[in-house]
Amino acid sequence: MKFKMNDITYVIKELSQKEYKELRVIEDEEDGVEISDVKNGIYQGSTHHTKGIVYIDKNLPHEIKRKTLIHELTHCYIREYITHEEKNYSEEMVADISANSHDIIHKIVEDYFGGDN
């Protein structure tokens, strides 16, 4: 599913652990960067801002998949509305981010799961 975050288009893709790990190696080779150490890790979700893709493990139970999507969409929100730099956030800033992003993120999640939240 495609969605926009501050007029930047992203797509949500569900992949298995194996598919994601194979894709990461290919992407790293294409981008000319050091190959990611994905062999030993387990991913639930990952956001690739430069490619505009949010990956979610397709084998997660519905409740965990939903939480993971919210988590990844929060990364998108922070990147597109706040900053692309590493930053330490105070509790007050986190509360503001959560409150300000809630409707945007939950609308995308609702659309993705067809209202089955």
PLM feature spans:
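Active-site scaffold of zinc-dependent metalloenzymes
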Residues: 1-64, 76-80, 87-91, 100, ...
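Short alpha-helical catalytic segment bearing the HExxH-like zincin motif
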Residues: 64-72
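Long, well-structured alpha-helical subdomains associated
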Residues: 109-117
